[in-house]
Amino acid sequence: MRIFYGTESGNSEMVASDIADEYGLEAEDLTELDADVFEAGTLYLIVCATHGEGELPEGVDEFADALRDSSPDLTGVRYAMFGLGDSTYPDYSKGSEVLDALLAELGAERVGEYGRHDAAGGSDCSEVGLSWAEMVVEQHALVPVG
């Protein structure tokens, strides 16, 4: 299992790091990864914020462009998505949806519930993210690493 994040203000990084700590893993910044990072047989937990008007965070858009350009066959790749946003804006959580659609287009399979944190709701994003990750891991019978 690997944990990736795309962040603008640091909240997605914090959530991903808290999840990674729970499983003895490292959270990895999407802006520092190559498009060939995905491997069949590995589950990816992806935490992604929304920036601007429903866009990916700065730098993550470049990762997405690299994925589009290289068009890898992601058949056999499983991922779970957790989006952060603020429902007072019309493009709530759209950044993660952009990445989700791209991964699906390339053949990857989203598993588990699509997790979301609404900044307007007042709940702690890490608590919501940890609950989501626990549910995904439990549903897919993964043994925690560490």
Please place each PLM-identified region on the residue numbering.
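FMN-binding flavodoxin-like domain, especially the glycine-rich phosphate-binding loop
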Residues: 2, 8-14, 21-22, 26, ...
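Short amphipathic alpha-helix with an adjacent loop that forms part of the alpha/beta core around
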Residues: 34-40
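Long, contiguous binding/interaction regions
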Residues: 28, 33
